[in-house]
Amino acid sequence: LGNTDAGETITAPPPAGVDVGVPVTLGERVVNLADPGGFRYLKTEIVLSLHVPGVVGSELSTEELEKQQATLNARLEPIKPQIQDILTSVLTAKTVAEVTTPEGKEALREQLIESLQPLLRQYQITGLYFAQFVIQ
């Protein structure tokens, strides 16, 4: 909606009925980037927003949201090794130059969604967020 005196941006909550998905963290990852010498690392935490049929994430109470997250985590547990493999494969193929620009991060986001979506057949990925993204 605007900026506060402290410089923080305030945004309005999504309109009622708009599905922002149910957020599910894929955990923290530390990987070597594909730079020559292999001395550059990426530490990231990725959060997916998943559309759950019949559920509008933005309308859930905190308790209902936690229940949905627990249910999703349990349903994703059998494919967690494949999810982790995709994350590792995609992230370790990137160089520092490819992931340091806003355009590079957006391309990485799109590639991860394209790579993960076939595995998550019954859930549409509505967003992928880098809760943490540190290059060293």
What are these regions (language model features)?
Residues 1-136:
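Flexible, low-complexity charged segments
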